[in-house]
Amino acid sequence: LVRKRCERLYEGRMGVWNGSLKAELRPAEIVLAKKTRSFTAAPLDTLLGAKVCVDDFNNWFYSKNMECPWTVGMTKFYKGWDEFLRKFPDGWVYCDADGSQFDSSLTPYLLNAVLSIRLWAMEDWDIGEQMLKNLYGEITYTPILTPDGTIVKKFKGNNSGQPSTVVDNTLMVLITMYYALRKAGYDTKTQEDMCVFYINGDDLCIAIHPDHEHVLDSFSSSFAELGLKYDFAQRHRNKQNLWFMSHRGILIDDIYIPKLEPERIVAILEWDKSKLPEHRLEAITAAMIESWGHGDLTHQIRRFYQWVLEQAPFNELAKQGRAPYVSEVGLRRLYTSERGSMDELEAYIDKYFERERGDSPELLVYHESRSTDDYQLVCSNNTHVFHQSKNEAVDAGLNEKLKEKENQKEKEKEKQKEKEKDGASDGNDVSTSTKTGERDRDVNVGTSGTFTVPRIKSFTDKMVLPRIKGKTVLNLNHLLQYNPQQIDISNTRATHSQFEKWYEGVRNDYGLNDNEMQVMLNGLMVWCIENGTSPDISGVWVMMDGETQVDYPIKPLIEHATPSFRQIMAHFSNAAEAYIAKRNATERYMPRYGIKRNLTDISLARYAFDFYEVNSKTPDRAREAHMQMKAAALRNTSRKMFGMDGSVSNKEENTERHTVEDVNRDMHSLLGMRN
């Protein structure tokens, strides 16, 4: 595949690029100014061929971030931003240059300069050289399909969807920056003493010696000569006011922490694009991570997250342990590379177990904040949410020793509960036991103590259990935990291995792959809802492709079905029920099975198919209706074990012997009597 794409690029056959609007939130004033940004996606042919040409150079380029005057490939976490800002000398003038309409303003001259750099760095390979030239020709003069169906051809600017956009943009700004410095009269040696700059795409950040600040005034015109629109008016004396890639570094514990504008972080919470509840929780966690350093904002996001976890369906995810969370210690580690202390981690686990109540633990959600309160307890129904202060905030599960300690505490609690149950046989006994891990306190003789409520065991020694030689043949501990799904052990549906053999057999007979089988089985399920799963069906079944009927032979379905086709289709019961409910959400729909039985209640339509699996959750009314329909379908039905014998011959051998004295051919002699 890649070879074919490279061949196409080598021959100069251009693909059509797809132009679309970027899905993003932008300030109202920018929208009113009609500065909506577009995105041009490369066709697959160009994309794969281009990656062969540019990937090696790009990987080298990423590896040189911070060593050379660019930050492409750096991470803002683990003190990456601190390293970046400390590259700028203290006391200099700092400028965050603002480039506008960058991609569309790039001239073919700059793109050709990037091509020259790549050709210089490239190995000696004539085919690759031609591919690279054709690629940058296509990037400069690109055929673009717009959303209204028009194809336009641009003659300048870079494409946002090509595989080397950021590296190419960085190189073009780098070339322009060197051009501006040389034009201002600074050679390489002088430049190192008076100017430090870093680039990432169209973002440019400059630190310049105060004695040479006037040079910045000439940069705008120098950049314009190469077609770039840059404003160098934003100048600062404090590094914390310097904006780069929409971030500015704020000092926390003498470390520069990168921070987005609070409005951008709140926008992550406001704009909900998620299709699954898990994705919504991940977006909130992302906002929490970005907000660290804005103490008030982090606290408010944690409060919002607490509220979200009390709402459906997020509360169920939290109970299942599927709600992501990052502790204060985790965030501090992410930005500063500082590990949490053992005391912090132990405090977190101790607080977790201290709040557990009863035999079934309630939902516990821990939130850390930077507030001065030690603990803020918020209760809602059976949910406890704890806000821990910065000093008390810890992260759990980071150390094996802590896990062992956690398991040990659980075992001690179980032993304590068993002791309490054993000591509850006498109703007058008073429990004076203390919490696990606490010192025994002196008992005040003036108090009555606490009574232990007796528990009834599910299985007791009084039960009559099957035994051999006095020993029980059942493992009661296993039986207490053995709660299989009814459908997995029911003999009304095929086993997993039987279903797998049926699937493989049908797939091979039909000559389909797994993706095609998925579509085909959709049609089969709907056909069986309408026509049933009788073992006597034959001929063909059909599914619709638009307005066209597509026939499939029924024979493979029945041949490979063991024990029966209905038991195979029982695996589709739940999906069929959901399909009928989906149809009824938009139209009145009753399967033919229900129509034939004259089922008048449309609310029972979802149960009106013959391979429906009745289970413990089936409503009584639906179960009765299904049984009545089944009884009506099978009324007066009988099956003969034997049919007519296929052998129709009834020949038999005549062993009768006659003589001339016999009366006739049917009668022997009557003792000498004659007519």
Swiss-Prot record:
A GO term for molecular function = RNA binding
Carries keyword Transferase?
yes
Q: Which Pfam families match?
A: Poty_coat, RdRP_1
Record keywords, A-Z: Capsid protein, Nucleotide-binding, Nucleotidyltransferase, RNA-directed RNA polymerase, Transferase, Viral RNA replication, Virion
Q: How is it modified after translation?
A: Genome polyprotein of potyviruses undergoes post-translational proteolytic processing by the main proteinase NIa-pro resulting in the production of at least ten individual proteins. The P1 proteinase and the HC-pro cleave only their respective C-termini autocatalytically. 6K1 is essential for proper proteolytic separation of P3 from CI.
InterPro entries linked to this entry: DNA/RNA_pol_sf, Poty_coat, Rev_trsase/Diguanyl_cyclase, RNA-dir_pol_C, RNA-dir_pol_PSvirus
Site label Cleavage, positions: 388-389
The RdRp catalytic domain is annotated at 92-216
Keyword Heme (UniProt)? no
Q: Where is the composition biased (Basic and acidic residues)?
A: 397-424
| Gene Ontology annotations of biological process type | DNA-templated transcription; viral RNA genome replication
| Catalyzed reaction equations | RNA(n) + a ribonucleoside 5'-triphosphate = RNA(n+1) + diphosphate
Annotated region described as Disordered, given as residue ranges: 397-447
Top-level taxon: Viruses
The family assignment reads: Belongs to the potyviridae genome polyprotein family.
UniProt name for this protein = Genome polyprotein
Source organism (scientific name): Papaya ringspot virus (strain P / mutant HA 5-1)
Q: What is the lineage of its organism?
A: Viruses, Riboviria, Orthornavirae, Pisuviricota, Stelpaviricetes
